[in-house]
Amino acid sequence: MGGESRYQIKIPSNQINIKNYYCSNSYSNPTLATPSLNPYFVTGFSDAEASFIILILKEPKNKTNWTVKTRFSIGLHKKDTLILELIKSYFGGVGTISPQNKESVQYRVGSLKDLNDKIIPHFDKYPLISKKQADFILFKKIINLMNHKEHLTLEGLQKILAIKGSLNLGLSDEIKTNFPNIRSMERPLVARPKINEIYPNWISGFTSGEGCFHVRIKNSTKSKLGVQVSLLFKITQQERDK
């Protein structure tokens, strides 16, 4: 009877691409300066793992009875906390890293100032190339409304809800019940990137988030050793980004 074993290897956190374009383990030496990530690595990793989140929550103390919260976040397994620390360092130390549960940690940037000063300028200069770029565009529109205090008025809140309707999972059932006349804004179209627009460091960052290296071992009568070894590199994505 034939048998098969599979081994899946995710890229370890100590093999990330730093600014000098080399993979390095040297940062583990506490006497050395912390390396800085290449900007395109950060964008590639964000295309794979980041989320642009808008939360609309009940808040009776506000004139609109609602509050708007913003968040840029990246969640990873706790063994990869180092990557989040390097990303936080890249963004000038803004945001927090905290446990989500026993096995995962999350990097969050929530303040408008930090989003305006660090997060948005980065993705304006080094844009996302997956369909997540549409989420960023919508997120940025909401941030701009909040910069002008429009989230504090009912009219402004309704504008935000129309945008959020096309962001991530859209509007919650609670929001739809309270704002039944909101019509979601059309989701921005993101052009397919040209090959020469995909930089090596973006590929490195994206692969660090989504890439897997598989080793498959199965019994084989054609091999002198009685087994056959196959190697596979794989990147998995949602249908919209294939």
Where are these regions (language model features)?
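Sequence-level preference for short, compositionally simple segments enriched
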Residues: 1-242
